[in-house]
Design a protein with these regions (language model features):
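Short alpha-helix in the alpha/beta-hydrolase fold that links the catalytic acid
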Residues: 343, 357-366
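Alpha/beta-hydrolase active-site loop
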Residues: 110-141
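N-terminal cap/lid segment of alpha/beta-hydrolase-fold proteins
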Residues: 13-47
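Glycine-rich "HGGG/HGxG" loop immediately N-terminal to the catalytic nucleophile
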Residues: 91-120
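Short, surface-exposed "cap/lid" segments of acyl-processing enzymes
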Residues: 45-102
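Catalytic histidine-centered segment of alpha/beta-hydrolase-like enzymes
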Residues: 381-394
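Alpha/beta-hydrolase-fold enzymes
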Residues: 142, 146, 156-325
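Short beta-strand/loop motif that positions the catalytic acidic residue
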Residues: 341, 347-349, 353
Length: 427
C-alpha cells in the first residue's frame, strides 16, 4: 500500500486506502410479519478526497444458502464498493449469523411473547421470499428515506431478487452473482441428487427412528435394572446402570453444514490448500481454489458457514426436479415475473460454475426487459469465490457502473443520438 498522503486523489486506488477509513459501521433490526427479528449490518460511506461516483446510494446485499454476512466481508468485496461510495446494507436471513435462533428467543423473552412458530428450523425458501426480503427492503428504504434502493444477491440471494423484482417496484437496479434462473439446467449430477432427495430424506428419517427406538428401549431397560438392583441393596451397581443425561429423540431438522466445514477445517493447512489447488481443475463445483487465498477461504470456513433447514434443501430439490423457481405458498412462478423486470440489471456468474452457468442463467437474460442488461461470466471462477476471491474488483466495477448509470438516468430513459437523415451522416 502506498502512503495516502503521497498519492494524488486522482491516482488513488482502493489498495491505497485503509478499509476502516471508508465507513461508519452500525447494526439495525427489521421485523418480519411472522415475528422474526432480522439484523442488518450497515457500512455507511464517509466523504473522502477522491471520486466516489455512487456516494450514498443504498445497496442491499443478500447472501446465499448456508452463509451469512461474511460471504461479503471475508474478502474485499465491501471495501471495493465503499471505495466508490456505496451505502451498504447486509441482510442476514432468518437463522443465519446475527439473525440467529438464539436472538429470537431473547427478543421473545424480553417482550413476553411466544417465539416465532417456525423457530426450530421449520422455515423454507418461501419464508425468505415472503417474509425476510420484504422486511429488509422496507427497513433499508425507511432508514435511508429512499423510495427505491439497489439490490445485489449471491446464489440463493440472487434468486430471491429475481422473484422480488418481478413483483415489486422497490429496486432501482439489480445485480445477481452466481444466481441461476433455471437451477440444475446443464448439471445432470445435481438433477440426479434432486431426484433422489425424497428417498434420501425418508431413509434418514427411518435410520433416526430406529436409533431413537434402540436408545429408548435401552434407557428403559437400564432404569428398570437400576431400580431392581437398588431394592436389593446393590446401590453402587444400580448407580452405574442408571441412565445419566437427559435425552431427547434425534430428528433430521437441518443440514449441519457448519459442523462438516469445521471438521474439514481441522485438516486444512496452507500446505494442504496448495495441494488441493493442483487438483482444482477437477473439483470446481463450488469453488476454484486458485482464485482465492488460503487465508480468506479458511476465514470464511470458520465464520461464514451456517446450517440450513431441511425444508430449504427440500425446496431447492423440488425446484430442480420441476425445472422452476416458485413460491409454493402463493403459487407464484418467478419466471412469470421476469418480463416485468425493466430496471438496470447485471447477471454475473463464474465460467466454471456448475450451479449458475451461462446455460442456467440464460432464461432471465432473455426474458428481462431492462435497457441496461449485462450478462457475463467471470473467467476462471466457480461459485463461492465470486464474492471473496481475486476477481471481485471487476465485479464491483460492474456494480458501480450499473448504479452510476441508473442514477444518471433517473426520471428519463437513456437514448443514443439519432441521425436525422443519411446526408447528415456523411457531412
Amino acid at each position: 500500500m502506498r502512503h495516502f498522503g503521497t498519492v494524488s486523489p486522482a491516482a488513488l486506488t482502493v489498495d491505497d486506502v485503509e478499509f476502516k477509513s471508508l465507513y461508519r459501521k452500525t447494526e439495525y433490526e427489521a421485523q418480519t410479519a411472522d415475528g422474526w427479528t432480522l439484523v442488518l449490518t450497515r457500512y455507511q460511506p464517509v466523504p473522502r478526497p477522491f471520486a466516489q461516483p455512487i456516494f450514498g446510494e443504498p445497496l442491499l446485499l443478500v447472501h446465499g444458502a448456508c452463509q451469512n454476512r461474511h460471504a461479503w466481508t471475508s474478502g474485499q468485496f465491501v471495501k471495493n464498493l465503499l471505495f466508490f461510495g456505496a451505502d451498504i446494507h447486509i441482510l442476514e436471513l432468518r437463522g443465519h449469523g446475527k439473525s440467529s435462533v438464539d436472538l429470537q428467543r431473547r427478543r421473545a423473552a424480553e417482550a413476553d411473547r411466544p417465539p416465532p412458530a417456525d423457530l426450530e428450523w421449520g422455515w423454507d425458501i418461501d419464508s425468505y421470499f415472503l417474509q425476510d426480503l420484504p422486511a429488509a427492503v422496507a427497513a433499508v428504504k425507511s432508514l435511508t428515506k429512499r423510495d427505491k434502493i439497489f439490490f445485489c444477491g449471491h446464489s440463493m440471494g440472487g434468486m430471491l431478487g429475481y422473484g422480488y423484482a418481478g413483483l415489486h417496484d422497490d429496486f432501482e437496479g439489480i445485480v445477481t452473482i452466481g444466481a441461476s434462473s433455471e437451477l440444475g439446467k446443464g448439471f445432470p449430477i445435481l438433477k440426479a441428487i434432486a431426484l433422489a432427495e425424497p428417498g434420501l430424506a425418508a431413509a434418514i428419517d427411518v435410520a433416526l427412528a430406529a436409533a431413537n427406538l434402540r436408545e429408548a428401549v435401552g434407557r428403559r431397560a437400564g432404569k428398570a435394572t437400576s431400580m431392581a438392583l437398588a431394592r436389593i441393596g446393590a446401590k453402587e451397581l444400580a448407580g452405574a446402570l442408571e441412565p445419566r443425561a437427559a435425552w431427547s429423540p434425534r430428528t433430521f431438522r437441518y443440514l449441519p453444514v457448519d459442523e462438516w466445514i469445521r471438521w474439514v477445517d481441522t485438516a486444512f493447512t496452507k500446505k494442504s490448500y496448495e495441494r488441493f489447488r493442483t487438483l482444482s481443475a477437477f473439483l470446481t463445483i463450488l469453488a476454484n481454489p486458485s482464485r482465492a487465498t488460503s487465508s480468506d477461504v479458511r476465514w470464511l470456513m470458520r465464520h461464514g458457514v451456517e446450517r440450513e433447514p431441511r425444508r430449504v434443501i427440500a425446496q431447492f430439490a423440488r425446484w430442480i426436479r420441476n425445472g422452476e423457481l416458485a413460491c409454493y405458498r402463493t403459487g407464484y412462478d418467478f419466471a412469470e415475473g421476469f418480463p416485468r423486470i425493466s430496471v438496470p440489471m447485471a447477471i454475473i456468474f463464474g465460467d466454471l460454475d456448475k450451479l449458475a452457468s451461462m446455460e442456467s442463467t440464460a432464461g432471465i437474460y432473455r426474458a428481462a426487459r431492462s435497457e441496461y442488461l449485462l450478462w457475463r461470466p467471470v473467467k476462471g471462477n466457480s461459485h463461492l469465490e465470486l464474492t471473496m476471491g481475486h476477481d471481485i474488483r471487476q465485479i464491483c466495477y460492474d456494480i458501480k457502473n450499473l448504479v452510476d448509470f441508473a442514477v444518471k438516468h433517473r426520471g428519463r430513459r437513456p437514448s443514443l443520438p439519432r441521425i436525422e437523415d443519411e446526408g447528415s451522416a456523411r457531412r
